[in-house]
């Protein structure tokens, strides 16, 4: 399989589709194992059904199923990976019936997490200069994990190879399947390639995948409305929101040293963005917006935290400016930079939620995001931040101006932002709500249950 990647250039979205098709075809060598697993799973369901009809259901109604959460991203620096790491930690600590399954350099198991070594990793064309890759898992290994863990449902956190493999395994074994709409793939494709046909193909394939699921989770109401408009049954859409660690992200983390490293002028207003450095995030437009405000005679500077394929282009754009590109940050350093800034702004149109917007507000700084986006659901316009009319440089500059010029207004918004995040559900609340939604996943096919009951009544069994 590795020779497929080594001997074939992967160019563009179509190339990725061809290679994924070839790899999935190769994986169909596992078909005999899948057929056998499906047969034994059906027999097991039948046996459970007989036992239930004669002796009663040993499982209390409303009990959530043991669930495997499959994700294509875990160790990377992005919102989905952060949520998965948090979930793995909290699942073990809170004894939640969830185990996260993620790609890793080797197969391993520990509390709350199982890592599987991919058969092969596919580089993503738009991120050739980056480490981002999609791992194709072994279906046989996933079957083993389901059997050994006693999983009763599968949840795909991402619609990539792990999610597709999870759907296939769930269907073979007759298990309920859920999926999270974690990334606006069609918008990403359009932003990265400019190819509307490719974006439409991605949209259609994603919609097809969501229609196969028993439940579809989404982080915001706006995204849920969009899925319903695409033909996804609204009755199976659930909101799986996000929490924020208000102890880690706290105004008390404000650091004189961090502030001094970013700007030596106490009167300069510091604008912060924390994001993956890629085209769709709109950071180039944010640079232009800050420059517009500065040209009007205001003391303002931009700090950029993150890494990604657009880093070289952004460094070139910043070469003769006083703005700073700080690279990736995590932990206490990131918390200190958040709390030491004056304004946060993310002019992205592709977010499904925007975890960094929550972290900025928890740190006590007002947040600017484009109107009519999932990001805007996280910010109360005029209270905890400002909804820019669009993601254009001109509209972002217009949103920045009142906060740059009025310190008291800025501080009031920051205080309101902190208070808003303090009243938000905690991560433990969010994960408990997710488990409650799992109770809506049926362990056994109701049609099969009805047929079994009729067989018993007819004296066949």
Regions found by a protein language model. Name each.
Residues 69, 264-281, 287-291:
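Conserved donor-binding/catalytic core segment of Leloir-type glycosyltransferases
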Residues 104, 222, 243:
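Carbohydrate-associated surface elements
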Residues 176-178, 186-208:
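Nucleotide-sugar donor phosphate/pyrophosphate-binding loop at the beta->alpha transition
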Residues 210, 328-329, 336-341:
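Short alpha-helical donor nucleotide-sugar binding micro-motif in glycosyltransferases
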Residues 226, 381-382, 386-392, 402-407:
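Conserved acidic donor-binding segment of nucleotide-sugar-dependent glycosyltransferases
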Residues 250-264:
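A short helix/loop element that forms part of the nucleotide-sugar donor recognition site in Leloir-type
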Residues 330, 349:
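Aromatic "clamp/platform" in nucleotide-sugar-dependent glycosyltransferases that forms part
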Residues 366-370, 379:
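Short hydrophobic beta-strand element within catalytic cores of glycosyltransferases
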